[in-house]
Amino acid sequence: MTETLAGLNPEQAEAVQTTNGPMLIMAGAGSGKTKVLTCRIAHLLQQGVRPYRILAITFTNKAAAEMRARVDNMAGAAAKDVWLFTFHAFCARFLRMEITKLGGYGSNFAIYDSSDSQNLIKQILKELNLDEKRFQPAGIASRISNAKNQLQSVSDFSKAASDFYNQKVAEIYERYQNKLLVNNAVST
């Protein structure tokens, strides 16, 4: 226990020893956030918390790798199953575990970035004989992404389309979603 508290100031030690519920550590660069989190993880493991019940999320790959190395060094084999990820890695892992509940997707799905999405939209525009100058792929991708972020289904989007342009965007959205499913891919 004293090893996990060594070199910590009183506020940091309190954060490490608080084991009831989740904890959010927010502080400036170089303030010891990574040290506090790694010490807290080691402390939780020492208290008998199962590693798979611990989740630590960082922003960068570098921070995640550094934290993983520190936790492994402090806790050894007990740290193997701690969930320690970047935001993106955690979300991808979670999706891979749960994607089958959406129907039609396998856990080996691809995640389309903006370039992939725009290329797929360009393909759809060609299929529909629509001009890329009028139906700009980046703009269409943005519209689809916004609809998804607002949980607007293809059907709802289509019902709201009141003019020719938006009706075509709705048709593109529907084809886009169908092609994602066929390609076992997801996008934002």
Predicted regions and their residues:
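Small-residue (primarily alanine) positions within well-ordered alpha-helices
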Residues: 15, 27-29, 56, 63-64
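Pre-Walker A adenine-sensing motif
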Residues: 6-17
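Short Gly/charged-rich anion-binding patches and loops
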Residues: 11, 39, 120
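Walker A/P-loop
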Residues: 20-39
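A basic/glycine-biased coupling hinge at the interface between accessory DNA-binding modules
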Residues: 2, 20-21, 42-188
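Conserved RecA-like helicase ATPase core segment
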Residues: 2-7, 33, 37, 43
